[in-house]
Amino acid sequence: MPQPVPTANRLLDLFSLKGKVVVVTGASGPRGMGIEAARGCAEMGADLAITYSSRKEGAEKNAEELTKEYGVKVKVYKVNQSDYNDVERFVNQVVSDFGKIDAFIANAGATANSGVVDGSASDWDHVIQVDLSGTAYCAKAVGAHFKKQGHGSLVITASMSGHVANYPQEQTSYNVAKAGCIHLARSLANEWRDFARVNSISPGYIDTGLSDFIDEKTQELWRSMIPMGRNGDAKELKGAYVYLVSDASSYTTGADIVIDGGYTTR
């Protein structure tokens, strides 16, 4: 059955997330894309389930601040995204705690720090397992819930690295994983056409702290290849996340929104 047209007509009502439950994985950092996606959803009234892998204190601090500032319910969960059984346990627990999941933002991931030749086989396996297989695990677990309830929105954090091979860093495993995430979203959009929408967001260089270990010379080279001349701020992504989880995007599925300051136009 085709998914219905929303009953709301006003734009603010279409973007509203009041009464909805949104999951955001990888939202334990102080200035990352995950916490900004969660913040955007909280601003629009959503209750939230946010996850962490190792930074429990960071996730709990973020949850406390979101509840205090926006008056929404926020619960924190530890999840090993590379273990399907743990992901399934987590999704079932969220449904038990909140009664439903309306949208799932699969944002958690790992970065690569070596190329194919210089890196180990386990380095490759780790990035692919977390970034691609882990995202697929999230999709599989929440997809079953979406199918049962008859609606849902899955948003995958991909990367501009799924469109281009970044220079000069060697991160083939990451590029491959993120390209896979983009096509995963497109494929699931078709597979889930009767009960859920699936889209991806491909950020460019965003100041989240994850690249702080990169030397300044390399970072200057990155910026020189961005038409807008600067890195992005994580808050510049939250509007896209809110759009894709809300009824404002009710006819959007299989899309990939590139937010990279123009990097991939070169």
From Swiss-Prot:
One of its GO terms (biological process) is xylulose metabolic process. It is an enzyme of class 1 (oxidoreductase). It catalyses: D-mannitol + NADP(+) = D-fructose + NADPH + H(+). It comes from the Eukaryota. Induction: Exhibits low expression levels on L-arabinose and L-arabitol, as well as on D-mannitol. Transcript levels are shortly up-regulated during the initial stages of germination. Its EC number is 1.1.1.138. NADP(+) binds at residues 53, 107, 140, 174, 178, 206, 208. The active site is at 159 (proton donor), 174 (proton acceptor), 178 (lowers pka of active site tyr). Keywords: Carbohydrate metabolism, NADP, Oxidoreductase. Disruption phenotype: Does not affect growth on L-arabinose and L-xylulose reductase activity remains unaltered whereas D-mannitol 2-dehydrogenase activity is reduced. Deletion does neither affect the germination process nor the hyphal morphology. Only during later stages mannitol levels are slightly lower. GO terms for molecular function: L-xylulose reductase (NADPH) activity; mannitol 2-dehydrogenase (NADP+) activity; NADP binding; oxidoreductase activity, acting on NAD(P)H, oxygen as acceptor. D-mannitol 2-dehydrogenase which is not necessary for D-mannitol catabolism. D-mannitol metabolism occurs via at least two different routes involving mannitol dehydrogenase (MDH) or mannitol 1-phosphate dehydrogenase, and the exact physiological role of mannitol dehydrogenases remains unclear. Belongs to the short-chain dehydrogenases/reductases (SDR) family. This is NADP-dependent mannitol dehydrogenase. It comes from Hypocrea jecorina (strain ATCC 56765 / BCRC 32924 / NRRL 11460 / Rut C-30).
